[in-house]
Swiss-Prot record:
GO terms under cellular component: collagen-containing extracellular matrix; cytoplasm; extracellular space; membrane; nucleus
List of glycosylated residues: N256, N468, N611
The protein's enzyme class: oxidoreductase
Species this protein is from: Danio rerio
Signal sequence, renumbered to the chain: 1-25
Protein name: Lysyl oxidase homolog 3A
Crosslinked residue numbers (Lysine tyrosylquinone (Lys-Tyr)): K620-Y656
SUPFAM superfamilies: SRCR-like
Disulfide bond positions: C64-C128, C77-C138, C108-C118, C196-C261, C209-C271, C238-C248, C318-C382, C331-C392, C362-C372, C433-C497, C446-C510, C479-C489
Sequence ranges assigned to domain SRCR in this UniProt record: 38-139, 166-272, 293-393, 403-511
């Protein structure tokens, strides 16, 4: 009897477990009138992104972000007429909507042709608020045959400001960039208009200057002449903390009409540029005080993952409640304007190390992000997949007009040509010598042209269409990688190029995404040990130059070499896979170890004295770049077995165990003492990355002749500059940069 009751209870529980999801989730039923429309809303945003709004049963509403995924975004973007989704946003990133929340707990596979085919709680069944409205970011590429009017019913408001600009005042500096002072002009559907300055305040100017890329404003010294203008906007009132003028209160005239501006004229602002956008900007940037904030992983100036300095170590910020006000505080602190976008979900790549801040809620007038209310982090609060990022407004400098790419197959690639003075006030185009050209120089070119990250830096461009430009005008270019223009980099004062001819001029290939490799520093510290390895086991290692030079004079096969061994775990935390520069047809077969080398040098291992002298070294040719393990939800793509493709997928890592050949430094000739262990990934910048400053790792090393200890292992850019100098006690290579 008891067994029968137990069986019935189990059956009931199983049925309840099966039926419950069907009670809560159902395929979204069609609209009663069959007319479902979609649009993107919110502000500020681009035309291919925004809060997703659905027109159902004659009423516009939103979609809740509960259970929202990229698969949902793919379906919605296709219904909006775009080919696919790039990302999605939660927590009303584009502002809260109004009216109904039509859909909640939507779960799509990604291949559905309509959101109606996805599972959800049903139309109008939601427990969300508009603070949970979902948004999408679609790839800016239209589906063939999709008429714009069919899929996006844009709610174009007469009052919407499409663009804002400063028209320079007449005077000595009218043609100088950036434009820091001028008449505020606003673009509407029907053209440009002015703002009546009656009641205009310095707080209003602060908002406009922020949009123009300037951190602060000043009083206007000169008033413009009387303008016969269309004053579409009147009575503007800002608090000064808005990220966009559209967030201020104001009065509008009707379209195609204007109202007079009694006793006033056009609004004029005067802005103060950040140090990096002033005359002599390179020299002044070097004199800047030690920063407490930085941006990492971005392709362009003024964008990147937000990192803050606490004590002597850099850490990231969690994206909970991250918004434009908080992002604008970061941007102004760094000498930019207000934030154009406050990005969540590690859109600029994941950081490493500590996460210092969570639930940051700035008012907008704080001098530093540390001044804003925020929560400390516990282990359960955040992961680096939630690192906050920003895209700041920066002043227009016209840098892209001084450079162009020619001969390439797309606008993202080509031979680099510079516009430089040619004498007599004439400017002419010229080429750059390809000698010594690397992906770091390509990074600067792609940044200057606004084309994203560098994919490749090319020393020969003979395979691209030739142009009538043949003269070399720059050579010996050596960049750190973070410069805004190529002329900011070191270069020869007099052109000197070993290989003449346009076919040996520098070229680049740019890309929206880039990889970013970092070493797991704690693992190096945990796995280090010393091995006395017999010479008869080291023939292959000797063939591949993995031993010190003194090994050539050893009594082979007798004796041994003393090896400092450790594991290297190399993570790709960027936004694109790390691939060898050369295709598999160019890989070199090494018979002794029975494997292919896809890169000549992938990693340097160095043991340095405290004065910076190299006392022992090693290297690791990338005989097998593959995905050893990946984070949850990420699939392996690269495997070396059977001459497979080599690389490291985003979110995966390649592990070189301590017990494999050449995973060591030969310290047979090293005396006991204190040293620095240094590991540098991708040391020759052979493959482009979004950030080279985190490619170096250092540890304090103590060797007593029998045992070895490592401590304070850290990435080269994880400490403040002062702490790093104290650590190394010597000048030289810092953060894998030239110093």
């Amino acid at each position: 009897m008891l067994r029968s009751e137990l069986r019935d209870m189990v059956v009931a529980m199983v049925l309840w477990g099966i039926l419950l999801p069907f009670c809560l989730s159902q395929t979204t039923s069609p609209s009663q009138d069959g007319k479902i429309k979609f649009r993107l809303a919110g502000y500020p945003r681009k035309h291919n992104e925004g809060r997703i709004e659905v027109f159902y049963n004659r009423e516009w509403g939103t979609i809740c972000d509960d259970d929202f995924t990229l698969a949902n975004a793919h379906v919605l973007c296709r219904q909006l007429g775009f080919v696919e989704a790039l990302s999605w946003s939660h927590s009303a990133k584009y502002g809260p909507g109004s009216g109904k929340i039509w859909l909640d707990n939507v779960i799509c596979g990604g291949s559905e042709n309509s959101i109606e085919k996805c599972v959800s709680r049903g139309w109008g069944n939601s427990d969300c608020t508009h603070q949970e409205d979902a948004g999408v970011i679609c790839k800016d590429e239209r589906l063939p045959g999709f008429a714009e009017s069919n899929i996006i019913e844009m709610q174009v408001d007469e009052k919407r400001m499409e663009k804002i600009r400063l028209r320079p005042l007449k005077g000595a500096h009218a043609g100088r960039l950036p434009v820091t002072e001028g008449v505020v002009e606003v673009k509407f559907k029907e053209g440009w208009g002015h703002i009546c300055n009656t009641g205009w305040t310095i707080k209003n100017s602060r908002v406009v200057c922020g949009m123009m890329g300037f951190p602060s404003q000043r009083s206007v010294g000169k008033k413009p002449n009387s303008l016969k203008s269309a004053y579409r906007i009147h009575s503007v009132t800002c608090s000064g903390n808005e990220a966009h003028l559209s967030a201020c209160t104001m009065e509008f005239s009707r379209a195609n009409s204007s109202a007079p501006c009694p006793g006033g004229g056009a609004a004029v602002v005067s802005c103060v540029p950040g140090l990096q956008f002033t005359q002599g900007r390179v020299r002044k940037a070097k004199l800047n005080p030690v920063p407490q904030m930085r941006l990492k992983g971005g392709a362009r100036a003024g964008e990147g993952r937000v990192e803050v300095l606490k004590g002597s170590e850099w850490g990231t910020v969690c994206d909970d409640h991250w918004n434009l006000q908080s992002a604008s505080v970061v941007c102004r602190e760094l000498g930019f304007g207000t934030a154009k976008e406050a990005l969540t979900g590690a859109r600029m790549g994941q950081g490493m190390g500590p996460i210092y801040m969570n639930e940051v809620q700035c008012g907008g007038d704080e001098k530093s992000l540390w001044d804003c209310p925020h929560q400390s982090i516990t282990a359960e609060d955040c992961k680096h997949t939630e690192d906050a990022s920003v895209i700041c407004n920066i002043p227009y400098m016209g840098f892209e007009k001084l450079m162009r790419l020619t001969g390439g197959r797309t606008r993202l690639e080509g031979r680099v040509e510079l516009l430089l003075p040619a004498g007599g006030g004439v400017r002419d185009w010229g080429l750059i010598c390809g000698d010594g050209w690397t992906s770091r120089e390509a990074m600067v070119v792609c940044r200057q042209l606004g084309l994203g990250h560098a994919s490749s830096g090319l020393r020969e461009t003979w395979y691209w269409d030739s142009s009538n430009v043949t003269e070399m005008v720059m050579s010996g270019v050596k960049c750190k990688g973070d410069e805004m223009t190529l002329t900011d980099c070191q270069h020869h004062s007099v052109v000197s190029c070993k290989r003449a001819g346009a076919q040996f001029s520098a070229g680049v290939i740019c890309s929206d995404m880039a990889s970013d490799l970092v070493l797991n520093a704690p693992l190096v510290e945990q796995t280090v040990y010393i091995e006395d390895r017999p010479l008869h086991l080291l023939y292959c290692a000797a063939e591949e130059n993995c031993l010190a030079k003194s090994a050539a004079q050893a009594s082979w096969p007798y004796g041994h070499r003393r090896l400092l061994r450790f594991s290297s775990e190399i993570h790709n935390i960027g936004k694109a896979d790390f691939r060898p520069r050369l295709g598999r047809h160019s890989w070199v077969w090494h018979e002794c170890h029975r494997h292919y080398h896809s890169m000549d040098i992938f990693t340097y291992y160095d043991l340095l004295s405290l004065n910076g002298t190299k006392v022992a070294d090693g290297h690791k040719a990338s005989f097998c770049l593959e995905d050893t393990e990946c984070h949850e939800g990420v699939s392996k793509r690269y495997e070396c077995a059977n001459f497979g493709e080599q690389g490291i997928t985003v979110g995966c890592w390649d592990l070189y165990r301590h017990d494999i050949d050449c995973q060591w430094i030969d310290i047979t000739d090293v005396s006991p003492g204190n040293y620095i262990l240094q590991v540098i990934i991708n040391p020759n910048f052979e493959v482009a990355e979004s950030d080279f400053t985190n490619n170096a790792m250092r540890c304090n090393c103590k060797y007593d002749g029998h045992r070895v200890w490592l401590h304070k292992c850290h990435l080269g850019d994880s400490f403040s500059e002062e702490a790093e100098k104290e650590f190394e006690h010597y000048p030289g290579q810092l953060n894998n940069k030239i110093s």
